[in-house]
A protein has these predicted regions:
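Metal-dependent phosphodiesterase/phospholipase catalytic core, i.e.
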Residues: 1-65
């Protein structure tokens, strides 16, 4: 299972929400489940951040854009 908190700890060089989406998409290739256990604190984090992260994980591009 991929935890968002783990992604944020392991990739502390991420500076934007868009970069986070890219990392989640990459990590999704080797994981089956995704747990959103924290809220990202990037200035560009959108109101629908949970939907966009879930979309990035499952590959639904209409949600990630």
């Amino acid at each position: 299972m991929l935890y968002l908190s783990e992604v944020l700890l392991q990739h502390h060089d991420i500076e934007t929400f868009e970069q986070l989406l890219e990392v989640v998409q990459t990590r999704a290739q080797s994981e089956m489940f995704f747990k959103i256990d924290v809220k990202p604190t990037y200035p560009d984090t959108p109101a629908n951040w949970e939907d966009r992260l879930e979309g990035a994980f499952v590959g639904i591009h209409s949600v990630t854009r």
